[in-house]
Amino acid sequence: MKTNCTICSALAFLLLCSYSVCSGASEQSSGLHTENEAVSIVLDILRSNDQEMQAAAIAMVKEMPGAEVTEALAKELPNLSAKSQVQLLSALGDRGDVVARPAVVTAVKAEDQSVRIAALRALGQLGDDSSVELLAQAAAGAKGAEQKAARDSLYRLRGQNVDKVILAVIPKAEAGIKVELISSVGQRNITTGVAVLLDMAKDSDRKVRTASLRTLKVIAGPEHLPALVELLIGAKSSSDRTEAVKTIAAIAHRISEKNGQAASVLAVLPSVKETVARCSLLNVLGRIGDNSALPVLTAALKDENVDIKTAAIRALADWPTPEPTAELLKIADSSGNKVHRILALRGFVRLLGLASDRPAGDTIEMYKKAMNLAPNAGEKKKVLSGLSNTKSLAALQMAAGYLDDESLFVEAGAAAIHIAGGIYANYPQQATDMLNRIFKTTKSDSLRQQAQEVLNNLEKAEEN
């Protein structure tokens, strides 16, 4: 490849000039003269079509000292091609001289998207609190890489007043910009913003409310739970309630005393009479999983309001530990409400899969009860799916009992294969026999393939 000799010479001169300026070998006036020549050479190279030289020149720009150099380069930024602007913007950002900020701000509004993206990235390095609104506006109005560049820069802006400005601008901003600023509060971990976001969680715009609740999950602490519970009680929509429940549960789990995690919810529950709000509080009790709330949920099962009963069952079904297992089995077995029976059965099966000190034999007996209570093939499939995570010979035998059932053989086979792989170390013969049986007899190509893969993997493990 031929290289422009003039540019080669210019670059060599640039290297010498940069070294001279950096080392202080020249007198002050001579140094200034050299800087001006160096900038001129860089700009000539950036205006050329020689990519190798441009890359070398940009690398040199990052090393050339002096705010005067930055200012001269920034001044010429609009006169360069889009590609050269992108390169120079990156170099200006790395230089860190704030004198380039006005030129970078102007470039944020360039027609060429690649220039806008480069300018947004550079603003993350050169910007301060005056850049907050510009970056939030860019993030709200853009998509893809441009939006990501604006967000990333907003999240990493430096300066002691940046966080304060973000919080001050939020209440006055348009909805889309509010959302971006609120998200930045979480990304920047601005814990002083809790009060602002509690207020924004009541905003008329759904997206603003959602963003506020999600960010509060990050920056709020247990001391804010009473206020968050009040937000849940007054939530405007089901989506608001869903987000509030997630936020409250996440923060409650940070309380070290497990039996005190639900205290803020339990404190207000007796005084809340409105059905939707009461159901929401029961829901969050299930997510928190504080055992001191179990008597409250058990009492709610006897409520005359069917919605309250349903919420209590759902809460027990969501419990993070196996404690409500017996209560759910009772409901699944004896409730006169079909929906309640199914909800309880599903919760019962879910809890059977949680870690416990229950003997393996007792667990299998409970799965058998669940199969007997399952009203249709769909619910029986859910039971077999839960059974597949139980690693015992009895579980393998139970799954095998449904291999000949036309409506269940696929789920039974999948469960048996999974269990066989899990118990092979203790029961190699039984596991191998089951896998071979499925491989030879199943009508499902998928099951046959799964069985063969497990057999192959077990064989390789034995060889090693």
Please tell me what each predicted stretch does:
Residues 1-10:
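Bacterial N-terminal signal peptides that target proteins for export
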Residues 9-19:
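Bacterial N-terminal signal peptides
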Residues 19-21, 464:
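Eukaryotic intrinsically disordered, low-complexity regulatory tails and linkers enriched
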Residues 26-35, 44, 52-67, 71-78, ...:
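Structural detector for internal amphipathic alpha-helices that build alpha-solenoid repeat scaffolds
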Residues 38, 228-232, 261-268, 332, ...:
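HEAT/HEAT-like alpha-solenoid repeats
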